[in-house]
Each structure stands twice: as structure tokens, then as C-alpha cells.
């Protein structure tokens, strides 16, 4: 069996981890930092005889942010959380491959931090791969680094520190997984008269309302057919010239009205059955439940410590595994709920409701609370994303709007400037949960 062809793009991830030289000092967003007051974490690779940033290849099906925090812990022993993304490094390898390394600003986490407890245990890298780790000042690190790309990353970190942009907060918007497709109920889906029933379309027995019934006895060829009842009056009899009082309903008219009423009742019953099969607030589907467990790694990588959720079932249920294992608290926010039924008709004060959602998002942006998660469904999520873009830098505002898929997160990194919060970077990440119900596409073979 021939060996598989190597991938031309090798994806790796790492972090520039920094801390204050004074362990009692706390970072404040927007506060300029003297580079001499911080230290950066470096690793020595005996194979290349160089100092570099901790990084490594992403495992099969592993999100890049998960690979970044895992590789840093394997190579240095430090559990970290990720901040703003840095410039992606690309360089050629042997065999026609290209290595792409994604970097983030990283900060160490205390051992008792909830985000640290959610991480999978790792094995330290062998000494043949990493034999030394050290904390160094940026000035010393610049002399130790051998790769020009690594020095550019350090210069970016130092510039952020001097400008008060090194410490940032994070707002994460999550779109919960989808609900399962409701099974078709045989009773509610059974057609009436051999086809789907609807008001004014069919009646029991298969005769369509408004269509021509079977001509009765005495009907003239080509004349409109009118149902007759044995022993009843001739429906084709000529009307008297002089106006007369309206005649009493005939048995045929009574039967027709009863049939029409039966159709309306049956249609209403079918709508009730459909509403039961497709509830307005469906629970999280089976695949969405699996995604909720894999979300723990994504949320832990950014150090999420608190979450807000809309009252919908899926928005709450997707956070259940994360909260159950001690990830943090979940606060339900009624203002983020979507009215049941048609939104335009259910919420007559749509503008006021949209203003409440935007105000909630703006309040979260102004807070300096580490990483905050918003699990929201429906139109409220779109409003929050729009509000985040409104606070963005020129690069964020000019970029295409973010459209989230089920189980996907949007991560907004916020700097607290003199004029208020500014979103300086936006990234999206997805869980890599495999869905056995969806067939995978096989790559075509070339012969």
C-alpha cells in the first residue's frame, strides 16, 4: 500500500506568553506598560540550538487555539489563556511543504483557575525536543532569538505594551448547535382525501371545495353542477321574477356547510399537531449535544469565566457541560429572548427590544472582566454581532460581517481606550465534532 501524500500546509500554533516581573501587579486594559516591567517565556530547542517561542503542530481534528495552549503547556509546563492574535508566520519546509504558525498573546493561569481545571492533562515534551525554558526581559529575548520572524513578533508585543494595548478583554458570541429535525407523525401528516389538507382545498371523501361535484339527476349538459339530495327541491328551477324571502337552508346546503366546517376543524387539528412536533423553542439536537462537550476546550483556551445566555432551550443547554464541570456561572438574560411565533407580530415594540439587546452588548464591551461568553439564538445574536462591529477599528468595520454556523464562536478582543472600548481583532473558531449522520466526501483519486 503506497504511503499517503504529505499535506502541503502544516498548521501549527503557539503563544508569546508574558507576565509582570512583579507578581503582585495586575494588568489593566488601556494602561501603558514599560517593557522593562514584563518578562516573556522562551524555549530552547537542542536540535536547532536556538531559542524560540513555544509552539507545535495541531493534532488531527484539533482547533488551533487548543493546539496553542496544549503546546505551551507541553513545552513549558505553564497553563495559559489566549488573548489577541498576532501575525501569522509562514515559511517553507522541505518536500514542498509550507509551515503556517498562528500566534496569540498569552498569559499564565493560576493552577486553581476554573479554565485550567478544564484542560486535558498533557505530557511534558522530551528533553530532546525542549531542554530549557526561561523567562526573559524583552531586551534580553531580542538578543537570544535567532529567527527574524520571532523578533518581529516580539517587537509587536513590545509596541502593544508601550501603547497600552497589551492587556485586552474578550467577548465571545456563541451560536448554539441545531435542534434535531422533528420526526414526521403519521397521524398529523396523513393527507385528507389523498392530498395535504388546507382550508378550502379538500374535504373528507376526497371532494375538493370549490371544484365541480358529480352532476346530479336532471342537470343540463354544460351547466354548472350542483349537488342534489333525494327528495329535495330541484336546484335548477327558475327563480321567481318578484323578490321573495330567502328560502330556508336545504339539506344540501347544510351538508356542504358541515363538510366545510369539518375541513376547518381538521386543519386546525393538523396545525396543533405540527406545533407539537415542531415546538417554538426546540431543545438541542443530538449532534448539538456532542458539540457542547467539545466547546469546553475552546472556552477554556480563552479563559472564559462567566457566561450569559438567552432564555431559549438551546442557548442554555449548550452551556450545561461547561457549567457542570465548573467552567463558570451562567446568567439568563430575558432581554436576549426571542418572542414565540412570528417576531414581527409577537413583539410590537421591536425597536425598543433591539435597543435593549444593543445596550446589553455595549455594557459587556465596556467591562474589564477577562473573557465573557454570550450564548444567543435568533435575531438577538445578529444584533449583538452588529453592535460589536460598531465598536470596531477601521479594519473591523471595513471587513465583511461575521456569519456564524451552529457550534461556532466569534471572539472579539477589546481594548479600553481613552474614548471607550475598541474592538481590535475578531476571529471565529469552530468545534471539530464529527457528525456520523453526514456522509464524508471522499477525495478523488488520480490514476
Label the model's feature ranges.
Residues 2-53, 172, 176:
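N-terminal strand-loop-strand
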Amino acid at each position: 500500500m503506497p504511503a499517503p501524500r504529505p499535506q502541503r500546509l502544516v498548521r501549527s500554533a503557539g503563544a508569546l506568553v508574558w507576565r509582570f516581573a512583579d507578581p503582585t501587579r495586575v494588568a489593566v486594559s488601556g494602561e501603558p506598560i514599560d517593557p522593562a516591567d514584563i518578562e516573556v517565556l522562551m524555549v530552547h530547542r537542542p536540535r536547532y540550538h536556538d531559542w524560540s517561542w513555544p509552539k507545535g503542530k495541531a493534532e488531527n481534528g484539533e482547533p488551533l487555539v487548543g493546539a496553542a495552549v496544549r503546546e505551551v503547556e507541553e513545552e513549558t509546563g505553564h497553563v495559559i489563556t489566549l488573548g489577541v492574535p498576532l501575525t501569522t508566520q509562514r515559511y517553507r519546509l522541505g518536500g514542498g511543504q509550507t509551515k503556517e504558525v498562528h500566534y496569540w498573546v498569552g498569559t499564565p493561569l493560576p493552577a486553581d483557575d476554573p479554565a485550567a481545571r478544564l484542560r486535558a492533562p498533557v505530557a511534558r515534551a522530551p528533553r530532546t525536543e525542549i531542554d530549557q525554558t526561561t523567562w526573559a526581559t524583552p531586551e534580553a529575548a531580542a538578543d537570544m532569538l535567532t529567527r527574524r520572524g520571532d523578533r518581529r513578533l516580539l517587537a509587536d508585543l513590545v509596541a502593544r505594551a508601550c501603547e497600552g494595548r497589551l492587556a485586552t478583554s474578550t467577548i465571545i458570541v456563541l451560536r448554539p448547535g441545531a435542534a434535531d429535525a422533528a420526526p414526521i407523525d403519521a397521524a398529523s401528516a396523513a393527507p385528507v382525501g389523498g392530498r395535504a389538507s388546507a382550508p378550502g382545498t379538500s374535504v373528507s371523501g376526497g371532494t375538493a371545495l370549490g371544484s365541480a361535484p358529480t352532476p346530479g339527476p336532471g342537470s343540463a349538459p354544460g351547466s354548472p353542477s350542483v349537488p342534489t339530495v333525494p327528495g329535495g327541491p330541484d336546484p335548477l328551477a327558475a327563480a321567481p321574477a318578484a323578490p321573495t324571502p330567502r328560502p330556508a337552508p336545504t339539506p344540501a346546503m347544510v351538508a356542504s356547510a358541515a363538510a366545510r366546517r369539518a375541513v376547518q376543524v381538521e386543519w386546525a387539528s393538523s396545525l396543533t399537531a405540527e406545533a407539537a412536533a415542531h415546538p417554538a423553542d426546540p431543545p438541542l439536537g443530538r449532534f448539538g449535544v456532542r458539540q457542547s462537550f467539545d466547546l469546553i476546550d475552546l472556552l477554556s483556551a480563552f479563559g472564559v469565566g462567566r457566561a450569559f445566555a438567552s432564555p431559549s432551550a438551546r442557548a442554555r443547554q449548550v452551556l450545561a457541560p461547561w457549567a457542570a464541570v465548573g467552567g463558570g456561572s451562567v446568567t439568563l438574560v430575558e432581554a436576549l429572548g426571542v418572542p414565540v411565533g412570528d417576531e414581527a407580530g409577537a413583539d410590537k415594540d421591536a425597536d425598543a427590544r433591539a435597543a435593549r439587546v444593543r445596550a446589553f452588548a455595549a455594557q459587556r464591551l465596556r467591562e474589564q472582566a477577562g473573557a465573557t461568553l454570550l450564548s444567543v439564538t435568533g435575531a438577538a445574536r445578529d444584533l449583538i454581532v452588529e453592535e460589536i462591529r460598531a465598536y470596531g477599528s477601521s479594519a473591523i468595520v471595513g471587513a465583511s460581517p461575521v456569519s456564524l454556523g451552529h457550534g461556532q464562536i466569534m471572539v472579539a478582543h477589546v481594548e479600553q481606550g481613552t474614548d471607550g472600548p475598541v474592538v481590535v481583532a475578531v476571529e471565529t473558531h469552530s468545534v471539530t465534532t464529527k457528525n456520523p449522520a453526514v456522509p464524508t466526501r471522499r477525495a478523488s483519486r488520480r490514476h
